[in-house]
Structure formats: C-alpha cells, structure tokens
Amino acid sequence: VQQRLPSRIDPPITFAHRGARAHAPENTLEAFELALRLGASGLESDVWMTADGVAVLDHDGVVKKGLRKRPISEYERADLPGHIPTLLELLQTCGSSYSLSLDLKDPDSAESIVEVIQGVDSTLLERTWLCEASLERVIELREIFGDTPIRLLQTTRLERIKGTPERRAEYLARHRIDGINLHRTDWNGGLVALFHRF
C-alpha cells in the first residue's frame, strides 16, 4: 500500500479539470457549475484571448465551423460559439469561493486575466494559480505582479527539464515562482517531496 504524502494545503484543493467533464461538455459553464456542486474546491481551464482581447475558456483553442478550423485568436468574442465561456462569465456564474487554475495559452494574457479577477473579487487572486509554459515568461510575470498575491507555476514535462528536478525546484523558488505544473504521469512520491522542500 502506497503511503499518502501530506498536503501543504489543508484541506487539499480538488481541481476539476475542465469542469465536471465526465457529466457535462468540458469547459462549459454547465461543467464548471456541476463540478462545484459535486464537491470540487477548484476549477481548471486553459485560457485563450480573442481578437478583441477577451479571455475565454477552451481546451483546444480552435473553432471548427464546417470543414475549417481557426484559432480563437482570430475571432471576436461575439463570433465565437455560445458554449465557449469568458472568464468573466465563469466568475459571474460560479462566484469566487473556490480556487482557480488557469493555463495561459497566450503569453500576453496574464495582465488581462488578473484585471478581470480583480474587477469581480480581488480576494480570489490569493486562490488563483496561473500556469505558464515558458520559464522566462513565468519569471517575468513574477516581476510584473510583484507582491500581488497570485500563485505562479511553470507548466512543463519532466523530460523537458534541463538539469535535475532539484535544480529546477531551487531555480523556481529563487525567483519566487510558487511551483511546477507537471503532467500527472510525471509525478511520484519522491518528486512531490522534493518540490515541497522548496
């Protein structure tokens, strides 16, 4: 029997990945609302920016119309299918009494996302986790946000880390990055314990 490692957050956050996607279409307001009703304490989604600068929640970041697929960034919000919610619609519909994990798919979206959250409930910033793939950009975001109480994570895969995981953990901690967002198959007890040390 594998021993369960203690959580550094009590109680641990149970993020609903793209909402309750086993019971409702993923990344829809219906899926997010249902996830919270089913007991999730956090919601997770990818965030894309539209051509007119609106943060929307979707996994693939493309819209299929007929036989054509086009990136969300080429559409204005009004031209997107209705099932794709904006970040603002999520907050207006689901409130702000949960943790929020957002994977940034547009490198320049973080500031807009923080503005939306602050405009609805600035206390949610303390429970918001922004995940950025670029190591350089996540460090830049810490400099931009300074002491703003927002959590910043680098998203990567274990195989992409140059050097050892311990060096990466130390590097992130030195730059005040709150953690790392690895794929679930990359994690094991040793890595959890290692990153908890920093």
What are these regions (language model features)?
Residues 1-198:
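Phosphate-group recognition and catalysis centered on beta-loop-alpha active-site segments
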